[in-house]
Amino acid sequence: MTMAARLMLVAALLCAAAAAATAQQATNVRATYHYYRPAQNNWDLGAPAVSAYCATWDASKPLSWRSKYGWTAFCGPAGAHGQAACGKCLRVTNPATGAQITARIVDQCANGGLDLDWDTVFTKIDTNGIGYQQGHLNVNYQFVDCRD
């Protein structure tokens, strides 16, 4: 392979990596809230009151893993969906206030965005109360390393 061909290959790989990184975030995404009540349900993804989609794969994870971050359902416009999303983490930002939090994907949804746990995520970034008043927030999210 010539040097020019190698440089073109490296450039193509860098572009692909940049595109993949960009695809792992979204802005102005609708985020509703859901009452998973993880603390009241012993952080049990399979509890009848929770019944999270990801319980099939993640319910047997250690309590320290299940309780490390607040919970969210994910059906956003960018990133993996279904089983491939289970257990991944999102950095969720309320651009209106700058409040941020890391949340773990434990469920799927159908609203085209996020369905944040009320106790562990939504109220933590709805610092001005507008999300509660409107019934939703518009947020930005980015997939991040959970550091598990």
From Swiss-Prot:
CDD domains reported in the protein's UniProt record: DPBB_barwin-like
GO terms classed as biological process: defense response to bacterium; defense response to fungus; killing of cells of another organism; plant-type hypersensitive response
Domain of life: Eukaryota
Entries under SUPFAM superfamilies matching the protein: Barwin-like endoglucanases (SSF50685)
PROSITE patterns: BARWIN_1, BARWIN_2, BARWIN_3
Keyword Signal appears in the UniProt entry: yes
Annotated S-S bridges: C54-C86, C75-C109, C89-C146
One Pfam family of this chain: Barwin
Annotated positions of the Pyrrolidone carboxylic acid modification: Q24
Signal sequence bounds: 1-23
GO MF annotations, alphabetized: RNA nuclease activity
Keywords: Antimicrobial, Disulfide bond, Fungicide, Hypersensitive response, Pathogenesis-related protein, Plant defense, Pyrrolidone carboxylic acid, Signal
Keyword DNA-binding in annotation: no
Domain Barwin: 24-148
InterPro entries for this protein: Barwin_CS, Barwin_dom, PR4, RlpA-like_sf
SUBUNIT field: Monomer.
Job of this protein: Shows antifungal activity towards B.cinerea and towards the wheat-specific pathogenic fungi F.culmorum and F.graminearum (groups 1 and 2).
Protein name (database record): Wheatwin-2
UniProt organism field: Triticum aestivum (Wheat)
